Amino acid sequence: MKFIDESLIRIEAGDGGNGCVSFRREKFIPKGGPDGGDGGDGGDVYLQADENLNTLIDYRFNKRFAAERGENGRSSDCTGRRGKDIILPVPVGTRAIDNDTKETLGDLTQHGQKMLVAKGGYHGLGNTRFKSSVNRAPRQKTMGTPGEKRDLLLELMLLADVGMLGLPNAGKSTFIRAVSAAKPKVADYPFTTLVPSLGVVKVDDSHSFVVADIPGLIEGAADGAGLGIRFLKHLERCRVLIHLVDIAPIDGSNPADNMAIIESELFQYSEKLSEKPRWLVFNKIDTMSDEEAEERAREIAEQLGWEEDYYFISAATGKNVSPLCRDIMDFIIANPREAETQQVAPEEVKFKWEDYHQERLAEHQFDDDEDWDDDWSEEDDEGIEFIYKP
């Protein structure tokens, strides 16, 4: 299945139904009171996280989603039916952004989490609502309000504990194949990895972590070179970054310069991301002796001013890979993920009595001269009358 991590869609909540102007007319009640019902509220649009999805491909071609409009009110005090909501399933880790204002509406980071992204319009009022002691035959109603409409940008950000950084052909995909059951493509040419991939690393029977592999970065990626930096967003939720460095590049380049390129591109993308914990791992030590690998790594670290620990591995042969995974697991256990902001559970949608309706009722509350009508019976002064028919 094609990996799609961005999609722009149009969402439209339902409009509110209009109120009804009606009067009770029966065989022996020729001049009954007002009985026009309210309209129904418009349907809402929700996003809901689904752990069974891993791509936004469902929204690649279907671009418009509209909730149902609320029905208009009817006579006999019948309230219009509320419009049906629509719930759009998205992968866990999806972020919703208003494309016009660039406002982030929220992140869906847990299975089943639901988020309101477009609110339906409020219902209009029927003429029964305008009945009073001085307005006994009201012929006023209100219209339903329009529902929210917006262009919504969906961004999928993979939820992983560990993110892999490095130039093309540094051995990131080979590393993931060595430590997990994931099988990303591996070849001897740059940009073999074209889309992000996830692998679950099982350290023991009770501990595991998720590692994310993204396409390699090159110099100028922040300006669009190579595959650009569009995939770096998948590392924003990682707890630690593994910077994989080819200790002996086949093109003869300086590994220290290669590391500086990655650091520069990372900083240009996001200062916050560049400040995440980052571990230095030298790969492909199977191409030389252990003594030569240690000496070369020490020289590279001195050139960079790297004062923290670093690791030597061979992803192809599996050498020193297990100790690295155990240290990563210990770090993850010692540094639990910060609690995600809890989304407030959506309340049950009920009929709203908002200022919109109150203001319109006030406009007609004391219009003695204009609204007086003798088309009423004495029973109408008792308020809203509900008629029950067998």
Swiss-Prot record:
Region (Disordered): 363-382
SUPFAM superfamilies recorded: Obg GTP-binding protein N-terminal domain (SSF82051), P-loop containing nucleoside triphosphate hydrolases (SSF52540)
Enzyme nomenclature, EC number: 3.6.5.-
GO MF: GTP binding; GTPase activity; magnesium ion binding
GO biological-process terms attached to the record: ribosome biogenesis
Keyword entries, A-Z: Cytoplasm, GTP-binding, Hydrolase, Magnesium, Metal-binding, Nucleotide-binding
Domain OBG-type G: 160-333
Gene Ontology terms: cellular component: cytoplasm
Primary enzyme class: hydrolase
Stretches with biased composition (Acidic residues): 366-382
Domain Obg: 1-159
Binding site for Mg(2+): 173, 193
Cofactor(s) in the UniProt record: Mg(2+)
Cross-referenced Gene3D superfamilies: GTP1/OBG domain (2.70.210.12), P-loop containing nucleotide triphosphate hydrolases (3.40.50.300)
Top-level taxon of the source organism: Bacteria
Major localisation: cytoplasm
Subcellular location: Cytoplasm
Subunit organization: Monomer.
Family from the record: Belongs to the TRAFAC class OBG-HflX-like GTPase superfamily. OBG GTPase family.
Function text: An essential GTPase which binds GTP, GDP and possibly (p)ppGpp with moderate affinity, with high nucleotide exchange rates and a fairly low GTP hydrolysis rate. Plays a role in control of the cell cycle, stress response, ribosome biogenesis and in those bacteria that undergo differentiation, in morphogenesis control.
NCBIfam families linked to this entry: Obg_CgtA, PRK12297.1, PRK12299.1
Name of the protein: GTPase Obg
Species the sequence originates in: Haemophilus influenzae (strain ATCC 51907 / DSM 11121 / KW20 / Rd)
